Amino acid sequence: MSQSVVVNPRPALKAKLTKEPFSIPNLKPYYKAWPTAVNPDYPGLKVALEARIKNLYPPKKAAKLIQDDYALLSSMWWPRATADRLQTCTFWFLWLFTWDDEIDQSTSDLFIHIHKANDFRKESLEYVKFCLGVGDDETAKWDFQNNPPNRPLIRSLDVIGAHLQKVYNHDQIMTFVNEIDYYMGCQQREQKRKLTGRLPIVAEYLETRMGTSAVTSMLALNEFADGNDIPRDIMTDPKMISLWYEVNMNMSLSNDLLSLRKEIKHGDIDSMVPVLVSARGLTVRQAVKETEAEINRNIERFDQIADALLEEIKLTHPEKVDEVASYIVGCRYNQMANFLWSLTTTRYGLGDMVRDAEGRIPIVIENVN
């Protein structure tokens, strides 16, 4: 009895993506008059972050991380934060990007061996809980007090946790922890799928993408960064949850577009455009156009939900209107920072690329070395 052979569809899809030139669209007009700013403490933060990077990572990796300029991303993300809180949030950014790269790169040992990745995720999550003072019986099994993690990357969470504990209440801390748990769980499901070689349908892709983006963990830091203390019934209001969803969708899709050249080049093709090409039979240009249109709709939805939320708060918590309005502005800063930094960072390699008259970036993957 002959056995059927499962063919990995990814090489054929990568070949298709490589053959068709496309352009990364100019998304700036969709954001209208959304605010942008750079935190005045950016120069000092850059120095502090460079020192931390050199202390945590080997020289070659450190040089690349310094070049990517995560201090600029953080300074645009939280332009109103005080210097000490901005530094803590930036150290979280650094941890998040480097932690994700440990597993997400298809050639890494942790990606290839999922049991090792699962252990890495488990130790990381339990150490997060330990550092934030919300450890449970599972955390106690690790005895981190006497046996800290061997990996400097995981261990570096201690500074972040200590500062958050001084500012956040238990509910705020648990929101942050739960979003990290959500992120790691989605990443695990995505890794399992990638290892099978199977390509997801659009709904399946989005189900994990909204977690692997890690956006909600960063949204959970906004109150810390900007000095807010918003009642939990507001933060769990359906409109606030919808607002978070739209922020997450915006960053996920815009990152999918802006990193597309890099992802195709490296064969990591689990993003919205390749999924649309695979699942719906679109051309690359059609898939890019559909993703662009959804980002436009997403921005419109965000503004509508923000207005509706403020109208509700005027009735239910009139004393909190200004604080919630400030939080919404912070979400706009977050999205603009993500977008503008992605256009210029060396991480995606778009900064020096030629734009056409409409601000689009023509891409020919075959010409990428």
Curated annotation (Swiss-Prot):
UniProt key word Metal-binding: yes
SUPFAM superfamilies per the UniProt record, alphabetical: Terpenoid synthases
EC top class named in words: lyase
Keyword Metal-binding found: yes
Motif annotated as DDXXD motif, chain positions: 100-104
Co-factor(s): Mg(2+)
Free-text domain note: The DDXX(D,E) motif is important for the catalytic activity, presumably through binding to Mg(2+). The conserved (N,D)D(L,I,V)X(S,T)XXXE motif is characteristic to type I terpene cyclases that form an allylic cation through the release of the pyrophosphate group.
Family statement drawn from the similarity comment of this UniProt entry: Belongs to the terpene synthase family.
The name this protein goes by in its record: Sesquiterpene cyclase hepA
